[in-house]
């Protein structure tokens, strides 16, 4: 069966499904016949996702896990595998922003962002890959950013983590191609997502980078006015899963495509 012939039993796991790109992607895939498992850090906070799914007559299963914790990821994916039997597609969406100039960003700050945006995705990959290799099929979609290709002003931790995830994704694609596993990198620009509301802290310890920080805030404002609906990213993700002519990279959204 070609990837474009989606079985109703195809199981897709979307991390960070509670909001933004993750929520839109989970709903979009469910609408197109996938058995969707959305991961959230707290099921108690998944009300909007579940309410929208109910309104649209869709079913989305939830799994509680925190990608920052190896133990949480192991337990969460064991739970999904117990319920679903297998995982066909992993969409690594969960992540955080991270602002700061190189001079003013501590090693701890870099590591904190890397632990989520890079290591969190890697933990999830390691949880699903043995089964995919054994079945010789599957897709891993890593959501990076336009900031994974082009440096952004005053976003050193975020840029570092996303560039690293791009490199790991390229490496992974080479490693797993022989097992019939596909890897795709989706690179959103500015998209309608809660990450911007959460990512407003602008360290300026020396006072030297105030203008750079201001430019970043201006870019956020322009992005908020022109942001691409998150479902458009979900559509690209589904295309990356289903296409018979796959690419490694898929830029999308305002400022990205």
Task: Name each model-derived stretch.
Residues 32-48:
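Conserved glycine-rich Rossmann-like NAD(P)H-binding loop of the short-chain dehydrogenase/reductase
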Residues 65-75, 107:
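The beta1-alpha1 cofactor-binding region of Rossmann-like NAD(H)/NADP(H)-dependent oxidoreductases
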Residues 101-102, 109-111:
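Substrate-binding pocket helix/loop in short-chain dehydrogenase/reductase
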Residues 145:
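Residue(s) in the substrate-gating loop at a strand-loop-helix junction
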